[in-house]
């Protein structure tokens, strides 16, 4: 199977956008193969046709991904030869989202700046999880198709994070689960995301939905809207939340995107 894909860099969350049509039944296997080939890549999305949007993005685990949404918007802008300094607004069809996702992209020197209006969290709740030292209670932020466990600094040790995430994700009915290590004082996250269909656990250098989850958890705890610049290994993602006194009513992320060249490869399973 000959595939074309583009390597895209949204805040170092290296994303492979496969532009050759791939059957859903083969996407997880194809994504796993590509991730073994592209050592810097952290996730794979598949371009599909949509009746209601310029394009549809199907992520490898069926999850919603803010950075990948931003990446698709930037890819469309390059395809349309958007001049530097100009902007385009899209409503994109993204896996894990029940409605079209608004995405605004501006062409800048060296790439693009994208803002995505994320689906609102379905829930933000405290849940208890087992560790070798007893149970810990942590906020779990659930979005369509993905949930994130937000762990403040010191709650879990770095050496046990991947094992704990795999263990905890078995109790969560999602194909994609993140464990977001949050240093609130430095306003920094270190995100680990486990995707069950591909059995991959990746320390992401930038995570849009993980940044949003941390911001939503803080919004609930602080009881106020937040405007945060959240550092992560690959850079900074800005997150803005709106709050009505009991729930998050608005959620956007903003980050940078750079696009690499298109590649062609013969996939052999």
Predicted regions and their residues:
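A glycine-rich beta-to-alpha transition motif near the start of alpha/beta enzyme domains, typified by
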Residues: 1-112, 142, 147-269
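Membrane helix-loop-helix hairpins that form the core translocation module of multi-pass transporters
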Residues: 112-120
């Amino acid at each position: 199977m000959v595939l074309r894909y583009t390597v895209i860099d949204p805040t170092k969350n290296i994303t492979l956008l496969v532009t050759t049509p791939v059957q859903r039944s083969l996407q997880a296997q194809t994504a796993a193969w590509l991730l073994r080939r592209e050592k810097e890549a952290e996730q794979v999305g598949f371009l599909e046709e949509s009746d209601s949007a310029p394009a549809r993005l199907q992520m490898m685990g069926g999850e919603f991904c803010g950075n990948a949404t931003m990446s698709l918007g930037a890819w469309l802008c390059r395809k349309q030869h958007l001049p530097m300094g100009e902007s385009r607004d899209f409503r994109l069809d993204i896996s894990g989202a029940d409605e079209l996702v608004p995405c605004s992209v501006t062409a800048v020197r060296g790439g693009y700046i994208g803002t995505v209006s994320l689906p609102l969290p379905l829930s933000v709740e405290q849940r208890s999880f087992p560790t070798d030292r007893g149970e810990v209670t942590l906020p779990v932020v659930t979005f369509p198709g993905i949930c994130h466990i937000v762990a403040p600094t010191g709650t879990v040790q770095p050496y046990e994070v991947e094992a704990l995430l795999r263990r905890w994700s078995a109790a969560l009915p999602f194909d994609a689960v993140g464990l977001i290590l949050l240093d609130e004082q430095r306003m920094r996250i270190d995100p680990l995301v486990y995707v069950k269909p591909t059995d991959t656990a990746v320390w992401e250098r930038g995570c849009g939905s993980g940044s949003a989850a941390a911001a939503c958890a803080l919004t609930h705890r602080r009881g106020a809207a937040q405007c945060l610049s959240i550092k992560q290994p690959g850079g900074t993602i800005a997150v803005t939340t709106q709050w009505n006194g009991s729930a998050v009513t608005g959620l956007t992320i903003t980050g940078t995107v750079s696009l690499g060249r298109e590649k062609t490869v013969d996939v052999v399973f």
